[in-house]
């Protein structure tokens, strides 16, 4: 029997696994998709928020500030791309200045460090490409940007290294109460566990309702984005927000840790995991963004994408044991600032186990830490040494991002190995650049096929059913005249 079963391995499930892996518990993760971080965690704004937006006294307010500080430490320890660039919330008219004052007061109450109000002149001095109509801004120096999928992957990898089991393509379809805890029905059979952590993202309501009386409703909400080429990456140097409204923090413009510019999102209620991009949605995003940064060159867009976030009707994170279901722990409704809060949210689950007296002493032999080979960032002498040791690092496969064969092979041999083309992209960046895999994609497919010992026809782009190749069009034949 398991001690803890975690349902879902986005950033919340990965953070929970990372925290629990510090203890001698039998813990397993059950992820419905074929990879970690393959839903909301891979398609969001990639912001670690400072914490001025949530209403004081809410879980969001406390866990946002705590989580962002913990995330900074974890990213440093696990070699995850992170940059504390700060954020600006703009007032684009005098009528919006009272809203900035309210956010400032929230920030003070929530313990956000270094937060202050700026004049129009101070704001434009920091970001000269902003609209000249700016009348002021709220500056939060603790806001940061991160690679969200690498953040989740890193925590999940360290958890697996320390004994947590990960079951991919393994949805939980039924939950039943037993004398000793819970029984989960999965494609690989019945799994018994003492505790369940519900970290199922937009599916968290459905998972909760399998085990306990209905308590909350999640409305999946789609947000569409532009990702612009690195030629636009320095258009702004801070995360640029407009004044938020009831639909969220509005359309932002921000640098990314990879050197691009990200613009979005809108907020459209959808059914399920509908990540289609729409002409109307993208037109709204570009028009809204130009209110903040008029000279963005959307002609430099290299990709449009959409993510779905879990808007919940409680107005706050849903955290705790479900009523009438002891041992079933919800970590649900993780809309923004869910990414920022993830490490602190995970610790809330650990506290529940501790309160029940079911948290043993931490492991003495815990193996923390993680390093990555990022070939293009190495000094020349280190590149030469690495190539001499492993010639695959001398063969550049992705020319846009200067990603080598060695890095792709690393992605295919990690604690949680990539099994798809997008899985490789999320781990090492191959296909992330200007051509979006147009040149390197076939070579990545070939390496996946060879390394995993599967037919090229079985290699997926991402989720189940996204086979890149459908059939062979030519076969070698011997012709004799």
Where are the regions that the model predicts?
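Dinucleotide-binding Rossmann-like beta1-alpha1 core, especially the glycine-rich loop
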Residues: 46-126, 250-251
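Short beta-strand to alpha-helix junction loop
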Residues: 62-65, 90-99, 138-157, 275-280, ...
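Iron-sulfur (Fe-S) cluster-binding segments and ferredoxin-like electron-carrier domains
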Residues: 404-415, 438-456
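N-terminal Rossmann-like FAD-binding beta1-loop-alpha1 element of flavoenzymes
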Residues: 2-28
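Flavin-dependent oxidoreductases
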Residues: 15, 175-180, 184-264, 268-278, ...
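C-terminal catalytic lobe of FAD-dependent flavoproteins
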Residues: 248, 257-258, 273-396, 403-416, ...
């Amino acid at each position: 029997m398991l001690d803890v079963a975690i349902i879902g391995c986005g950033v919340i499930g990965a953070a929970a696994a990372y925290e629990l892996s510090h203890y001698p518990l039998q813990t397993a993760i059950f992820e419905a998709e074929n990879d970690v971080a393959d839903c909301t965690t891979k398609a969001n704004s990639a912001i670690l928020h400072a914490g001025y937006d949530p209403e004081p006294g809410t879980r969001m307010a406390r866990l946002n500030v705590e989580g962002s500080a913990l995330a900074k430490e974890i990213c440093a320890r696990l070699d995850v791309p992170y940059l504390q660039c700060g954020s600006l919330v703009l007032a684009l008219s005098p009528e919006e200045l009272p809203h900035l004052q309210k956010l400032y007061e929230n920030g003070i109450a929530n313990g956000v460090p270094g937060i202050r109000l700026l004049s129009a002149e101070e704001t434009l001095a920091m970001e000269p490409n902003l609209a000249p109509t700016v009348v002021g801004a709220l500056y939060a120096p603790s806001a940061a940007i991160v690679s969200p999928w690498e953040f989740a992957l890193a925590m999940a990898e360290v958890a697996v290294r320390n004994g947590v089991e990960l079951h991919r393509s393994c949805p939980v379809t039924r939950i039943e109460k037993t004398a000793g805890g819970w029984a989960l029905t999965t494609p690989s059979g019945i799994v018994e566990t003492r505790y369940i952590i519900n970290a199922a993202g937009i599916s968290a309501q459905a998972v909760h309702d399998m085990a306990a009386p209905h308590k909350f409703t999640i409305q999946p909400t789609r947000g569409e984005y532009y990702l612009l080429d690195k030629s636009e990456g320095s258009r702004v140097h801070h995360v640029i927000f407009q004044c938020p409204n009831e639909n969220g923090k509005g359309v932002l413009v921000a640098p990314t840790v990879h050197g691009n510019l990200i613009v979005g999102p809108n907020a459209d209620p959808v059914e399920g995991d509908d990540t289609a991009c729409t002409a109307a949605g993208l037109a709204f995003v570009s028009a809204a963004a130009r209110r903040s940064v008029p000279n963005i060159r959307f002609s430099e867009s290299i990709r449009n994408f959409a993510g779905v976030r879990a808007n919940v009707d409680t107005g706050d994170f849903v955290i705790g044991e479900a009523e009438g279901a002891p041992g079933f722990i919800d970590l649900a409704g993780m809309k923004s600032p869910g990414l920022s809060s993830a490490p602190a949210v995970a610790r809330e689950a650990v506290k529940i186990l501790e309160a029940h007296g079911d948290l043993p002493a931490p492991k003495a032999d815990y193996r923390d830490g993680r390093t990555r080979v990022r070939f293009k960032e190495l000094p020349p002498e280190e590149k030469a040494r690495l190539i001499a040791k492993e010639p695959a690092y001398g063969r550049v496969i992705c020319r846009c991002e200067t990603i080598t064969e060695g890095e792709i092979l690393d992605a295919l041999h990690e604690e949680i190995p990539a099994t798809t083309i997008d899985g490789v992209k999320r781990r090492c960046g191959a296909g992330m650049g200007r051509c979006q895999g147009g040149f390197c994609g076939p070579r990545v497919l070939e390496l996946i096929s060879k390394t995993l010992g599967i037919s090229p026809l079985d290699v997926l782009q991402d989720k189940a059913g996204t086979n890149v190749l459908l059939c062979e069009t030519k076969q070698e034949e011997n012709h004799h005249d």
